[in-house]
């Protein structure tokens, strides 16, 4: 798996988010996340425990097996990282529009 380049001139922004919806990050929430991340040019990776995946990959996100009450960390590098992380924070707070 690809790791975050820590030698970049831009410092990564990191946001840890709590998965609050009942079913966790399954196909639909993963697609919602990717819909947001793909609108931005920044690089984004998602970590759960020791595993890191590309935040622009539905399959990668599903492989994290992030269930309810899991914490996932978004690591974004680029000029538009902050607004993207803000959108993701809102999406997680809305519980992916699920009950």
Give each language-model segment a name.
Residues 1-13:
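SAM-dependent methyltransferases
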Residues 8, 60-62, 83, 89:
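Intrinsic-disorder/low-complexity peptide segments enriched for small residues
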Residues 10-16, 71-73:
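Intrinsic-disorder/low-complexity, polar/charged segments enriched in Ser/Thr/Lys/Arg/Asp/Glu/Gln
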Residues 14, 27, 93-94:
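Short, intrinsically disordered low-complexity segments
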Residues 14-18, 45, 85, 89:
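A general secondary-structure boundary signal
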Residues 18-59, 63-67, 76:
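Compact, glycine-rich, soluble single-domain proteins
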């Amino acid at each position: 798996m690809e790791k975050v380049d820590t030698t970049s001139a831009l410092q990564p922004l990191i946001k840890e988010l709590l998965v609050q919806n009942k079913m966790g990050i399954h196909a639909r929430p993963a697609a919602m996340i990717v819909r947001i991340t793909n609108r931005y040019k920044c690089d984004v990776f998602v970590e759960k425990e020791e595993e890191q995946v590309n935040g622009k990959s539905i399959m990668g996100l599903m492989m994290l097996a992030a269930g309810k009450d899991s914490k996932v960390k978004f690591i974004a590098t680029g000029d538009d990282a902050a607004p993207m992380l803000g959108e993701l924070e809102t999406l997680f707070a809305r519980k992916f529009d699920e009950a």
